[in-house]
Amino acid sequence: MIIRSAEFVISAVQPSQYPDTDLPEIAFAGRSNVGKSSMINLLVNRKNLVKTSSTPGKTRLINFFDINGQLMFVDLPGYGYAKVSRKEQKTWGPMVERYLSSRKTLRGLMLLMDLRREPREDEFLMMQWCAHYDIPWKMVLTKADKFKKTAADRRRHEIARAVGIGADEMILFSTLQKMGRDPALETIARMTGILEE
């Protein structure tokens, strides 16, 4: 799948603000500071399509991006950042679940997790939502450059056991090393039914 164009469309909170489009959508979810913005930027080969921030909890809206005029990437707000106010933490769940439950054009979700961390309640909640709403999902293990290859693979198997899926169903990803871009794009092409070029 070759990405030729990528444009920001809109930021939304409520379903009434979502773009009125029939394009298939792929959502990106994960903890604050896991690397969602960096992953999207690498996939589209643009440095600043999605603004990256060293401040966790910065993305508090649902951001929509038009890719090739063929599909949409949807950047969901990061979860689990303690310094975000309690009120904002409480709005995260309903905002994200509303999107997952109501968006008929949603074709799949990329669930990002830092390879250095253990899966927590929020990751399991996202997996439960995907199962409940029948959304195909793929786990992407970010920051893989922090490990040597064998250690990264060992961590992948440990996390796979913890979440109950096969290690080969996960993508090791590193923005710095440009690792995992092709497998991620292949997954997105499969989920959306867009033929690879």
Curated annotation (Swiss-Prot):
Q: Which cofactors does it use?
A: Mg(2+)
Q: Which GO terms describe its molecular function?
A: GTP binding; metal ion binding
Q: Which gene encodes it?
A: engB
> What biological processes does GO assign it?
division septum assembly
Q: Which UniProt keywords apply?
A: Cell cycle, Cell division, GTP-binding, Magnesium, Metal-binding, Nucleotide-binding, Septation
Quote the protein name from its UniProt record. Probable GTP-binding protein EngB
Which parts of the sequence belong to the EngB-type G domain?
Answer: 22-194
Q: Which residues bind GTP?
A: 30-37, 57-61, 75-78, 142-145, 173-175
State if Cell cycle is listed as a keyword.
yes
Function, as annotated, reads: Necessary for normal cell division and for the maintenance of normal septation.
